[in-house]
Every structure is written in C-alpha cells, then in structure tokens.
Amino acid sequence: MKIKQILTNRNLSNGKDYGIVNEWEDVFSQLLDVPLYYDDWKRRDKTLFWKFPWLASFYQTSIPTFAYVMLPIASPHGNNKKNIIPCMIDFYCREKDELQQFYKRYDKCPLVLISSKEAYDFLVSIKCPLNIKHLPLSISDKYRINDKTIFNKKYDVVMLGRQNAVLQAFLNKYSEQHHDVTYVYGKKEGHGFRYFDQSGQDLGCMSTREDYMNLMRLSRIGLYATPAMDGGRTDTNGFNQVTPRFLEYLVNGCHVIARYPKNSDTHFYELDKMTTRIETYKQFEEAMDRLRCKDVDVSYYSQYLEKHYTSNRVQILSNYLEQI
C-alpha cells in the first residue's frame, strides 16, 4: 500500500496539543512526498454523526490516507475505511464496551497504529482482532540538534502546562529552602496558561508553539511525569504513556527530573538512561543541587534523539506499508 495524502484538521483545531501533531503531519507529507488533505467538517451534521457514527465514512476520502487520531472513540471522524491508516495518539480503552467500540470503529482499516508501547502490548495480550502495529510518538525534525548546538539558559526550571502534583510540591519546598532558585510557573487562564517568573513578573501566555518551545529552551531542568503518575490524570485508565513533552525537554537541552512507573513505553524511550528518576524530596533536592550547575551532554542527547525524530517514524510506517 502506498499513502497518497496525510489527513489534517489544522483548519479546524487550535492549541499546542494539535500544533505538535501538525508538525508530525508536515514531516510525513514532506518525506512521503504527498499533500495534506484538509478534513472538511463544515458540510457535516455533527449531531447526526454522533448518533450514527458509521455515516461519517461516506463523507471521508477514498484515497489512500494516513491520519493521526487524538482519541480513538471520542468522535465520529469517519476513518473506518479500507484506504485509511489511522495512528492512535492517546489510547485509554480498557473496559470491554470501550474496546468493542474501538474494534468496530476501525475494523475496515488495513492497519491500525498504536503510539503507546504499553497500550500496544495490552492489546496484543488480549488478542485484539485488528491488525495493529506500534508507531511511537516523536519530535519534529525541525528541532534537530547536533553536538555543536549551544543552549543559553536563563532559568533553573520552567514548568509548562499541567504539572505533576508531587513534583510541584517538591519544587515549592525547594524554592522555600533555596532562595536563589529561578523558575517559571503557569496559572490557568481560560483554556491555557499565563506564565510568571519566581519574582511574579508576567511573561505572557505563550500562545503559539514557537513561544512554548522558546520558553522551554531557557530552562536548565524539566520536571516530567507520565500522565497517570501520582493520580494525575484519571482519564487514562491507568495507562502511563511517555508524552512528547519528554522529547521536547531533551531537544531544548534540559536535564529531566522525572517520576514514572516502569512499563514497556518508559522502557522503549529509555527513561532510566535519559532522566533522573526520583521518589523522595531528598532525592529531588540532591538532583536539583547537582543539575542546576551542570550543562547537558549535547552529544549524548543528539545521538539519542536521532532515534526519535519524526523522519524515523516515517521510515517505520513505510516498512509496515510494504507488508500490506
């Protein structure tokens, strides 16, 4: 099978979560030398398709298409067709009824890609009837670094988006005991965050993908946790996928202090080699003291990231397609 286009909904969606998806789509489009296909929801009666999801397929393209799907059973997107290869970004289905919905939603697709190794292994273990393969998440090649890359740091820690409660509490305690620490934190504002430094200076909303990455690039240390760690997100049904923020920290030259369970996804991304894993405040304090005054090993980072740029995922997909 040969992909002829990449499905995108960038004309309808916004926000940094979809911004990174659009970056992946751009790399797939460029390297496969195929156009982007803009999903046209303007002519669709969403209420009707929510009631009868199978109808959406009649309005979807008939050309061989690759599509990223944010949530596999959340909306009637019409991707259940023999010409569409969907890749599930977030897969949280565990209950029997959810799994049956998932199977039914994609039973016509010749191949269904699962981004989480943990979720993929789970589906294999329960004998998922679909033809599934693992296609990991990535970081766009536009951010590629090499051993000559120089990072100019301004803050010890920059906290972007939702935070792990334990890491947040540890940093609060650390800042009370170490008054020289510099950090950036966010306050919820509308659907996003407004950011401030440790002195209370307003840094703005970082509303674009570029703003987000540029601010992260100023941080020496990133605090990272998988989504369900410490009771963080309950909607993941216990799945603890490694999210792209981990790769964003690395490509922006940040040390990573992390909390995560050991599973096949954290093993795939080698978090044990690429982060300082902590359990207690004492471990956190020791890691902060050490990493605040230490540069990252850019050569080590660049070698690791070569395995996780989006171009690598394009090659994996191409290999899968040769088997169809």
Regions found by a protein language model. Give the residues of each.
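N-terminal pre-catalytic "stem/leader" segment of glycosyltransferase-like enzymes
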Residues: 1-126, 259-263, 314, 323-324
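Catalytic binding pocket for nucleotide-activated donors in carbohydrate/polymer assembly enzymes
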Residues: 22-28, 32, 209-213, 217-321
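Flexible internal linker/loop segments at domain or repeat junctions
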Residues: 41-49, 191-201, 224-233
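A short acidic, often aromatic-flanked loop/helix-cap motif at beta-alpha or helix-coil junctions
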Residues: 42-46, 94, 140-144, 188-194, ...
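Catalytic core of nucleotide-activated saccharide and alditol-phosphate transferases
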Residues: 76-190, 309-312
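Short gly/ser/thr-rich secondary-structure transition/capping motifs
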Residues: 141, 202-206, 237-238
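Short, surface-exposed amphipathic charged segments that create phosphate/polyanion-binding patches used
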Residues: 146-158, 194-202, 288-297
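Conserved active-site histidine-acidic residue motif and adjacent donor-binding/catalytic loop
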Residues: 194, 199-218
